[in-house]
Swiss-Prot record:
Family from the record: Belongs to the short-chain dehydrogenases/reductases (SDR) family.
GO annotation, cellular component aspect: cytoplasm
UniProt entry keywords in alphabetical sequence: Carbohydrate metabolism, Cytoplasm, NAD, NADP, Oxidoreductase
Assembly and oligomerization: Homotetramer.
Full protein name: 2-dehydro-3-deoxy-D-gluconate 5-dehydrogenase
CDD domains assigned to the protein according to its UniProt record, in alphabetical order: Ga5DH-like_SDR_c (cd05347)
Gene name linked to the record: kduD
Superkingdom, taxonomy of origin: Bacteria
Length: 264
Protein backbone atom coordinates (compact mmCIF):
# COMPACT_ATOMS: atom_id res chain seq x y z
CA UNK A 1 0.00 0.00 0.00
CA UNK A 2 1.41 3.36 -1.01
CA UNK A 3 1.89 6.04 1.63
CA UNK A 4 0.46 8.43 -0.97
CA UNK A 5 -2.94 7.22 0.20
CA UNK A 6 -2.37 9.21 3.39
CA UNK A 7 -1.03 12.31 1.64
CA UNK A 8 -2.72 15.60 2.59
CA UNK A 9 -0.07 17.93 1.18
CA UNK A 10 -1.61 21.05 -0.31
CA UNK A 11 -5.00 20.44 1.30
CA UNK A 12 -6.75 23.18 3.25
CA UNK A 13 -8.21 22.10 6.60
CA UNK A 14 -10.60 24.19 8.69
CA UNK A 15 -10.49 22.98 12.29
CA UNK A 16 -12.94 24.68 14.63
CA UNK A 17 -11.76 25.21 18.19
CA UNK A 18 -8.14 24.73 17.19
CA UNK A 19 -6.37 27.32 19.35
CA UNK A 20 -5.57 24.75 22.05
CA UNK A 21 -6.16 21.24 23.34
CA UNK A 22 -7.26 18.29 21.26
CA UNK A 23 -8.31 20.50 18.35
CA UNK A 24 -4.80 21.89 18.11
CA UNK A 25 -3.31 18.39 18.38
CA UNK A 26 -5.35 17.13 15.43
CA UNK A 27 -4.68 20.27 13.42
CA UNK A 28 -0.94 19.96 14.09
CA UNK A 29 -1.05 16.37 12.88
CA UNK A 30 -2.58 17.49 9.59
CA UNK A 31 -0.24 20.47 9.36
CA UNK A 32 2.88 18.38 9.88
CA UNK A 33 1.57 16.09 7.13
CA UNK A 34 1.48 19.05 4.75
CA UNK A 35 -1.97 20.60 5.05
CA UNK A 36 -2.62 24.32 5.49
CA UNK A 37 -4.50 24.85 8.75
CA UNK A 38 -7.31 27.36 9.11
CA UNK A 39 -7.33 28.05 12.85
CA UNK A 40 -10.64 29.00 14.45
CA UNK A 41 -11.55 30.31 17.86
CA UNK A 42 -14.08 32.71 19.33
CA UNK A 43 -12.50 34.02 22.53
CA UNK A 44 -10.06 36.63 21.19
CA UNK A 45 -7.93 37.49 18.20
CA UNK A 46 -4.88 37.50 20.47
CA UNK A 47 -5.47 33.85 21.32
CA UNK A 48 -5.77 33.00 17.63
CA UNK A 49 -2.57 34.89 16.84
CA UNK A 50 -0.75 33.10 19.66
CA UNK A 51 -1.95 29.74 18.34
CA UNK A 52 -0.80 30.59 14.81
CA UNK A 53 2.65 31.41 16.19
CA UNK A 54 2.74 28.00 17.88
CA UNK A 55 1.82 26.25 14.62
CA UNK A 56 4.41 28.21 12.68
CA UNK A 57 7.14 27.28 15.18
CA UNK A 58 6.66 23.70 14.00
CA UNK A 59 6.82 24.66 10.34
CA UNK A 60 3.07 24.47 9.82
CA UNK A 61 1.35 26.89 7.47
CA UNK A 62 -1.56 28.37 9.42
CA UNK A 63 -4.02 31.25 9.12
CA UNK A 64 -6.67 32.30 11.63
CA UNK A 65 -10.30 33.37 11.56
CA UNK A 66 -12.35 34.41 14.58
CA UNK A 67 -16.04 33.50 14.40
CA UNK A 68 -18.75 31.97 16.55
CA UNK A 69 -19.59 28.52 15.20
CA UNK A 70 -23.12 28.74 16.65
CA UNK A 71 -24.04 31.90 14.72
CA UNK A 72 -24.95 31.15 11.13
CA UNK A 73 -24.33 34.66 9.80
CA UNK A 74 -20.77 34.64 11.18
CA UNK A 75 -20.12 31.14 9.85
CA UNK A 76 -21.42 31.96 6.37
CA UNK A 77 -19.32 35.11 6.17
CA UNK A 78 -16.21 33.35 7.47
CA UNK A 79 -16.49 30.41 5.07
CA UNK A 80 -16.86 32.79 2.11
CA UNK A 81 -13.86 34.79 3.29
CA UNK A 82 -11.70 31.69 3.84
CA UNK A 83 -12.48 30.30 0.39
CA UNK A 84 -11.72 33.69 -1.20
CA UNK A 85 -8.52 34.41 0.73
CA UNK A 86 -7.01 30.98 1.44
CA UNK A 87 -8.62 28.63 -1.06
CA UNK A 88 -11.18 25.84 -1.19
CA UNK A 89 -11.72 24.02 2.08
CA UNK A 90 -10.88 20.35 1.49
CA UNK A 91 -11.16 19.13 5.07
CA UNK A 92 -13.49 20.25 7.85
CA UNK A 93 -13.05 19.13 11.45
CA UNK A 94 -15.95 20.15 13.68
CA UNK A 95 -14.11 20.17 16.98
CA UNK A 96 -15.40 23.22 18.90
CA UNK A 97 -17.37 22.17 21.93
CA UNK A 98 -18.23 22.84 25.57
CA UNK A 99 -19.32 20.80 28.56
CA UNK A 100 -21.30 21.78 31.65
CA UNK A 101 -21.12 19.36 34.56
CA UNK A 102 -24.48 19.64 36.29
CA UNK A 103 -26.98 16.94 37.33
CA UNK A 104 -29.99 17.05 35.01
CA UNK A 105 -32.48 17.87 37.79
CA UNK A 106 -30.39 20.90 38.73
CA UNK A 107 -29.54 22.08 35.22
CA UNK A 108 -31.05 25.26 33.82
CA UNK A 109 -32.75 24.90 30.45
CA UNK A 110 -30.61 27.74 29.08
CA UNK A 111 -27.43 25.85 30.01
CA UNK A 112 -28.73 22.64 28.41
CA UNK A 113 -29.56 24.52 25.22
CA UNK A 114 -26.15 26.21 25.15
CA UNK A 115 -24.36 22.86 25.23
CA UNK A 116 -26.57 21.46 22.47
CA UNK A 117 -26.14 24.62 20.38
CA UNK A 118 -22.34 24.43 20.48
CA UNK A 119 -21.85 20.65 20.45
CA UNK A 120 -24.61 19.60 18.03
CA UNK A 121 -26.15 22.53 16.17
CA UNK A 122 -22.86 24.25 15.32
CA UNK A 123 -21.41 21.21 13.46
CA UNK A 124 -24.58 21.28 11.35
CA UNK A 125 -24.22 25.02 10.68
CA UNK A 126 -20.53 24.92 9.77
CA UNK A 127 -20.90 21.76 7.69
CA UNK A 128 -23.89 23.18 5.82
CA UNK A 129 -21.92 26.17 4.54
CA UNK A 130 -18.62 24.37 3.93
CA UNK A 131 -20.19 21.35 2.24
CA UNK A 132 -22.21 23.46 -0.21
CA UNK A 133 -18.88 24.30 -1.84
CA UNK A 134 -17.59 20.73 -1.54
CA UNK A 135 -20.68 19.54 -3.43
CA UNK A 136 -19.81 21.80 -6.35
CA UNK A 137 -16.27 20.39 -6.39
CA UNK A 138 -17.47 16.79 -5.87
CA UNK A 139 -14.89 16.21 -3.14
CA UNK A 140 -14.48 16.76 0.57
CA UNK A 141 -13.83 15.30 4.01
CA UNK A 142 -15.84 16.14 7.13
CA UNK A 143 -14.84 14.89 10.58
CA UNK A 144 -17.14 15.45 13.54
CA UNK A 145 -15.53 15.16 16.96
CA UNK A 146 -17.83 12.89 18.90
CA UNK A 147 -17.12 11.36 22.30
CA UNK A 148 -17.35 8.18 24.31
CA UNK A 149 -20.49 9.92 25.59
CA UNK A 150 -21.90 9.35 22.10
CA UNK A 151 -22.23 5.75 23.33
CA UNK A 152 -22.37 5.89 27.14
CA UNK A 153 -24.03 7.96 29.81
CA UNK A 154 -22.30 9.43 32.83
CA UNK A 155 -23.46 11.37 35.86
CA UNK A 156 -23.71 15.15 35.50
CA UNK A 157 -22.96 15.36 31.76
CA UNK A 158 -26.45 14.69 30.40
CA UNK A 159 -26.55 17.67 28.04
CA UNK A 160 -23.11 16.86 26.66
CA UNK A 161 -23.99 13.17 26.19
CA UNK A 162 -27.26 14.08 24.48
CA UNK A 163 -25.45 16.42 22.10
CA UNK A 164 -22.63 13.99 21.33
CA UNK A 165 -25.06 11.12 20.85
CA UNK A 166 -26.94 13.34 18.43
CA UNK A 167 -23.70 14.24 16.68
CA UNK A 168 -23.01 10.58 16.01
CA UNK A 169 -26.41 10.26 14.30
CA UNK A 170 -25.91 13.56 12.47
CA UNK A 171 -22.62 12.15 11.17
CA UNK A 172 -24.43 9.12 9.78
CA UNK A 173 -27.12 11.26 8.17
CA UNK A 174 -24.58 13.62 6.63
CA UNK A 175 -22.76 10.60 5.23
CA UNK A 176 -26.02 9.23 3.85
CA UNK A 177 -26.93 12.47 2.07
CA UNK A 178 -23.51 13.57 0.85
CA UNK A 179 -21.74 10.35 -0.15
CA UNK A 180 -23.11 10.68 -3.69
CA UNK A 181 -21.06 13.88 -4.03
CA UNK A 182 -17.81 12.08 -3.15
CA UNK A 183 -17.85 13.61 0.32
CA UNK A 184 -16.93 11.37 3.24
CA UNK A 185 -18.30 12.21 6.68
CA UNK A 186 -16.98 10.38 9.72
CA UNK A 187 -16.28 11.01 13.37
CA UNK A 188 -13.52 10.67 15.93
CA UNK A 189 -14.43 9.77 19.51
CA UNK A 190 -11.64 10.69 21.92
CA UNK A 191 -11.19 8.92 25.22
CA UNK A 192 -9.52 10.55 28.22
CA UNK A 193 -6.44 12.57 27.30
CA UNK A 194 -3.59 14.24 29.10
CA UNK A 195 -4.23 17.95 28.59
CA UNK A 196 -3.76 21.10 30.64
CA UNK A 197 -7.41 20.80 31.68
CA UNK A 198 -6.96 17.30 33.11
CA UNK A 199 -3.57 18.01 34.72
CA UNK A 200 -4.99 18.69 38.23
CA UNK A 201 -6.58 15.23 38.41
CA UNK A 202 -3.82 13.26 36.67
CA UNK A 203 -1.92 12.60 39.88
CA UNK A 204 -1.37 9.37 41.77
CA UNK A 205 -4.01 8.85 44.41
CA UNK A 206 -6.63 11.10 42.85
CA UNK A 207 -9.86 9.04 42.65
CA UNK A 208 -10.62 9.97 39.04
CA UNK A 209 -7.06 9.33 37.90
CA UNK A 210 -7.18 5.90 39.52
CA UNK A 211 -10.56 5.27 37.88
CA UNK A 212 -9.26 6.12 34.39
CA UNK A 213 -6.13 4.01 34.76
CA UNK A 214 -8.23 1.07 35.96
CA UNK A 215 -11.04 1.57 33.42
CA UNK A 216 -8.79 1.90 30.36
CA UNK A 217 -7.31 -1.38 29.03
CA UNK A 218 -4.23 0.58 27.94
CA UNK A 219 -3.93 1.63 31.61
CA UNK A 220 -2.99 5.22 30.85
CA UNK A 221 -4.27 8.58 29.70
CA UNK A 222 -4.04 9.26 25.98
CA UNK A 223 -1.46 11.58 24.48
CA UNK A 224 -3.20 14.26 22.36
CA UNK A 225 -0.84 13.35 19.52
CA UNK A 226 -2.54 9.93 19.44
CA UNK A 227 -5.44 11.61 17.64
CA UNK A 228 -3.33 12.70 14.66
CA UNK A 229 -3.35 9.30 12.97
CA UNK A 230 -7.13 9.05 12.93
CA UNK A 231 -7.41 12.63 11.68
CA UNK A 232 -4.96 12.02 8.84
CA UNK A 233 -6.64 8.74 7.87
CA UNK A 234 -10.11 10.30 7.72
CA UNK A 235 -8.77 13.34 5.83
CA UNK A 236 -6.93 11.39 3.14
CA UNK A 237 -7.65 9.15 0.16
CA UNK A 238 -7.12 6.18 2.48
CA UNK A 239 -10.69 6.72 3.75
CA UNK A 240 -12.40 7.35 0.40
CA UNK A 241 -14.80 4.42 0.93
CA UNK A 242 -15.27 4.99 4.67
CA UNK A 243 -18.47 6.86 5.45
CA UNK A 244 -20.64 7.34 8.51
CA UNK A 245 -18.35 5.76 11.10
CA UNK A 246 -16.90 6.98 14.38
CA UNK A 247 -13.30 5.98 15.12
CA UNK A 248 -12.89 5.74 18.89
CA UNK A 249 -9.41 6.66 20.06
CA UNK A 250 -9.90 5.66 23.68
CA UNK A 251 -7.29 3.09 24.68
CA UNK A 252 -9.97 0.40 24.56
CA UNK A 253 -12.49 1.80 27.05
CA UNK A 254 -15.51 1.08 24.87
CA UNK A 255 -14.28 -2.47 24.24
CA UNK A 256 -14.85 -3.57 27.84
CA UNK A 257 -17.12 -3.18 30.85
CA UNK A 258 -14.02 -2.61 32.94
CA UNK A 259 -12.54 -4.63 35.77
CA UNK A 260 -12.77 -4.72 39.56
CA UNK A 261 -10.41 -2.31 41.27
CA UNK A 262 -8.56 -5.21 42.91
CA UNK A 263 -7.94 -7.07 39.63
CA UNK A 264 -4.49 -6.87 38.05
Amino acid sequence: MSVDLFDVKGKIALVTGSTHGLGMAMAKGLGLAGATIVVNGNSSQDKIDSAIAEYEKEGIKAVGYKFNVAKEDEVQAAVSKIEAEVGPIDILINNAGIIKRTPLLEMEVADFKEVVDIDLVSPFIVSKHVVKNMVERKAGKVINICSMMSELGRNSVGAYAAAKGGLKMLTQNMATEWAKYNIQVNGIGPGYFATSQTAPIRVDGHPFNDFIINRTPAAKWGDPNDLAGAAIFLSSKASDFVNGHVVYVDGGILATIGKPSNEE
